[in-house]
Amino acid sequence: MFSIIVPSYNRKEEIPALLESLTKQTTYNFDVVIVDDCSKEPVEVTQSYPFAVKVIRNETNQGAAESRNIGARNADNEWLLFLDDDDRFANDKCQKLADVIADRKSTRLNSSH
């Protein structure tokens, strides 16, 4: 249902904690697309998770906005969520959003900050 887009630049140490926090979601109706924006030390995901994780590495630094766009173009799901590498979702965010979408079948865009 969701692809969570995570831009990251020179903060690979944030990624394990971010992914671990997503294991606390009350549903796993999502995958994660991490866009490594040409960090000095590349982002690597070596652990398995109960959701798919894809890492894309930019060959040149593109900035956070373009990295989000790259993530969106490489997303596999219909709904996109954006999460910075040093931020965390509430544990029930994906479930609550799925419930809202199910209740409002014609919804095409939701935003929460």
Positions of the model-derived regions?
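A conserved hydrophobic helix/loop-capping motif in glycosyltransferases and polysaccharide synthases
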Residues: 2-14, 18, 25, 35
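Acidic donor-binding segment of Leloir-type glycosyltransferases
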Residues: 19-57
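Glycine-rich, basic loop-to-helix element that forms the pyrophosphate-binding segment
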Residues: 58-75
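Conserved donor NDP-sugar-binding/catalytic core segment of glycosyltransferases
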Residues: 88, 92-108
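Positively charged, low-complexity/disordered segments
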Residues: 109-113
